[in-house]
Amino acid sequence: MMEFFPEIPKIQFEGKESTNPLAFKFYDPNEVIDGKPLKDHLKFSVAFWHTFVNEGRDPFGDPTAERPWNRFSDPMDKAFARVDALFEFCEKLNIEYFCFHDRDIAPEGKTLRETNKILDKVVERIKERMKDSNVKLLWGTANLFSHPRYMHGAATTCSADVFAYAAAQVKKALEITKELGGEGYVFWGGREGYETLLNTDLGLELENLARFLRMAVEYAKKIGFTGQFLIEPKPKEPTKHQYDFDVATAYAFLKNHGLDEYFKFNIEANHATLAGHTFQHELRMARILGKLGSIDANQGDLLLGWDTDQFPTNIYDTTLAMYEVIKAGGFTKGGLNFDAKVRRASYKVEDLFIGHIAGMDTFALGFKIAYKLAKDGVFDKFIEEKYRSFKEGIGKEIVEGKTDFEKLEEYIIDKEDIELPSGKQEYLESLLNSYIVKTIAELR
Ligand code: XLS
Ligand code: CA
Ligand code: CA
């Protein structure tokens, strides 16, 4: 079998003093924390599309990336080479999961029947490679946004034929995700939204989206797919407005259509910031709803208004993200998928490794800091004290539903002073900084 990365050694943990760009500084996959190796807390995954398909094209320029698998001109040879490259890449980095869209892994034929046959051949190759490897499928998905047929949407299109095409495509994607043992299946509605309301039947589009998701739930039951269904919110791009705007919007939609019990969320950092939220906000919202499923690990650039999908290197953000994951009880059928691409000018194969190492180290460090914060109950203690008034007296009655407007008026009407606690934001922020510094100082 062809080797795609002969110059890259197996990436080792060398510790915080290491200056080797091809080594982990903070991430030791086998380090046991809370009875579990770090690799099982973090469940890193490679995104097939960014790492093996994307070639560094942007709206202004041609591909820049050096990718040895693209030397093959035959589309099938290229597809198989990408699969082989994925397995070699994951093994060298000690990454146990990957994610893909149907159209990332195999070229399209003239009809859907032909496309499905081609897809089956590549799925066979993946299954073959899985046999003697630890690499597993985190989640699969269908690309319902690249082909021109999806210009008006997929489940929310104006064309019943396109709706049928999308349904058949998801049906097949569910089958192959099941066949490959995928832990989850993602719905990201890249074209499920609108450009202008002047030409949009908003009511019908939303109803059709619900019909589509229900059919997916029913088909998954029928074939015995037990993976977790995940909605990935994003407010805009490529459409001006996307229906799964953020966690709160998507949750209300699911509730409204009686679909909430079947779905959790796949939260992407860059999508959170595009929605005007922090990554932490989206994760917290999903957590309190009991719906934190998986994460697309990346970061955006706050000065740019689009989805830059950069490798996550911001310790503060990964700390707050892992804090939410820990408080949610950790990942079950989910993980940290690097939906991230190296910059167009980082065009060497080596940069793919460096990007993933940077992301893995940053999340490992974030996890360690967050673990201490959670264990010491730093924020919990503060929050509990801040809301103490709801634990006794009138507050307790409010919480237990034992009071009403009249009783509350009677209680408060002659009271002269109300005593309030301080929010102490600055104190908590500097405490967080101390935990970051303390954790780093204790690292090997
Ligand atoms: C695009 C999305 C997409 C989903 C999967 O912005 O992040 O890649 O994760 O379809
Ligand atoms: Ca994503
Ligand atoms: Ca993205």
From Swiss-Prot:
Subcellular location field: Cytoplasm
Catalytic function, reaction form: alpha-D-xylose = alpha-D-xylulofuranose
Spans traversing the lipid bilayer: none
Cofactor: Mg(2+)
Keyword entries, A-Z: Carbohydrate metabolism, Cytoplasm, Isomerase, Magnesium, Metal-binding, Xylose metabolism
InterPro entries: Xyl_isomerase-like_sf, Xyl_isomerase-like_TIM-brl, Xylose_isom_bac, Xylose_isomerase
MF terms (GO), sorted A to Z: magnesium ion binding; xylose isomerase activity
Sequence positions that bind Mg(2+) 2: 268, 271, 307, 309
Disulfide bonds: none
Annotated family: Belongs to the xylose isomerase family.
Descriptive protein name: Xylose isomerase
Lineage: Bacteria, Thermotogati, Thermotogota, Thermotogae, Thermotogales
